[in-house]
């Protein structure tokens, strides 16, 4: 998920999304250990989504305003 899409969500929705990502990462790791993981790049994507969500939550905590790039 892109950062712009995540910034449109409120804190409660972001925390729910963060929980979903952690659960997905857990399941992906479990599949990897069992040898059933077919989408080998997915754990990396989920970890990056977690980092994006945590960054946005921290920005809001500190009151940092992010400029939109306009791309």
Swiss-Prot record:
CDD domains: Ribosomal_L29_HIP. GO terms for biological process: translation. GO terms for cellular component: cytosolic large ribosomal subunit. Gene3D superfamilies: 1.10.287.310. GO terms for molecular function: structural constituent of ribosome. Keywords: Ribonucleoprotein, Ribosomal protein. It comes from the Bacteria. Pfam families: Ribosomal_L29. Signal peptide: none annotated. HAMAP family: Ribosomal_uL29 (MF_00374). Belongs to the universal ribosomal protein uL29 family. This is Large ribosomal subunit protein uL29. It comes from Roseiflexus sp. (strain RS-1).
